[in-house]
Amino acid sequence: MKLPIYLDYSATCPVDPRVAEKMVQYMTMDGTFGNPASRSHRYGWQAEEAVDTAREQIAALLNADPREIVFTSGATESDNLAIKGVAHFYNKQGKHIITSKTEHKAVLDTMRQLEREGFEVTYLDPESNGLVDLAKLEAAMRDDTILVSIMHVNNEIGVVQDIAAIGELCRSRKVVFHVDAAQSAGKVAIDVQEMKVDLISLSAHKAYGPKGIGALYVRRKPRIRLEAQMHGGGHERGFRSGTLPTHQIVGMGEAFRIAKEELQQDYDHALKLRNRLLDGIKDMEAVTINGDLDQRVPHNLNVSFAFVEGESLLMALKDLAVSSGSACTSASLEPSYVLRALGLNDELAHSSIRFSFGRFTTEAEIDYAIELIRVAVDKLRAMSPLWDMYKDGVDLNTVEWAHH
């Protein structure tokens, strides 16, 4: 067993060996290394053909038209292009946007930027299970609302939003609907026709593809217009200029092809591992599972261990590669803003760990993880005076702490 055990698949996945093997063929003199935009010779034609194939593979996973796929450097850029692109193009129709408080920073920070530019953003509070209430979303809509941006699967707590219902609502109100699907593509089925989504952000490295490549799905019927954020040679139908990285695009295409073929297999494997981990820790005292347990992907388990400091638990679990919150924010000592939005207090939010598993995780690794978690939590609680007070029946919320 390789230590530390990797249980941080929501941060990134290892590249599937089949994907890596394919990518290598598009880099060197022996392979297809040409620029897809070179129209005058075979090197360019072959590269363009490889890009077209990848575009088809990505579109197939979404039940989309290949012409609706725009390549970007990743989901962060896709979020920026979608949100700023819509805001700047449709600003004559209105300047109001709706999103939720539990979105990824790539969405929230983009919204903050638009607020500085004079747009008005409504941030919806999720329910305590992490899901957005459709009635609250509808109530927030106004005549000048131009965009709704709600993620499909949350990166910290793994809950799955009812995208089809939100899409129906947005379509009936003629509001553009953007979805960040970085955490759901390849994990759950996505059908853009059924879901009535206008824009979808995609990432390759969350689906066993390479880092540094992503895509934005841009609906053609009804046509969605965007203002480009990256200017230059007019690549990607003018949406996103820049030479296309053939090897990365081929990697993303292959990763999405495999994801489509093995979707059910991967899902069942993750579910088995998640249930195994849950069964191994659910009888522990003062343990909370964060987020709805039914409407969530099985690849994620976010757990709060009360009376244990999250940072010290991470240190104690040095043989497990896990995180507290998302990789993008886990470097900060602030409690997770996602868990705070669910109504968890600072202490509980601070004591949470995200376990995320995937294609290459084994049952033996989960069993080893359970053992480590139980020992570490018991050891840390044994050192905690708060744990002693809790065991003595003291309600810690009513204690008046003296400030010396």
Curated annotation (Swiss-Prot):
Belongs to the class-V pyridoxal-phosphate-dependent aminotransferase family. NifS/IscS subfamily. Its main location: cytoplasm. The modification N6-(pyridoxal phosphate)lysine is found at K206. GO terms for cellular component: L-cysteine desulfurase complex. Its cofactor is pyridoxal 5'-phosphate. SUPFAM superfamilies: PLP-dependent transferases. This is Cysteine desulfurase IscS.
